[in-house]
């Protein structure tokens, strides 16, 4: 991860780690704060509706990849989803060399269930990352392919 971040900083020195491993307690706190913010922004939302909306950009405790230690959020800015698209494209291109993939790519929400996140990278190993990138596969699509090959 340190090598990947260093390589990203060679592309843009302002690239920095925003989040890595998260405990269940921290993910609970973060998730609940997002739900409360959605309800404050739209008082007509029920808690269930707010949770459904939140789950398009943050996972509930126990479901977040950050709890595995395999996911990182990194960007050039502190406000997520505001990085320069050209810079993100360059970082996405080098990610497989370090075993990472952009976890929730643009146009793949139907596969991942999560909207585009230009900051969220997942470690899958170099070989898998290179294959997934070459074939434009999400982790979900890649896992289906692996299961089919083992049949």
Please provide the spans of the model-predicted regions.
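Cell-envelope/glycan interface and biosynthesis
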Residues: 1-150
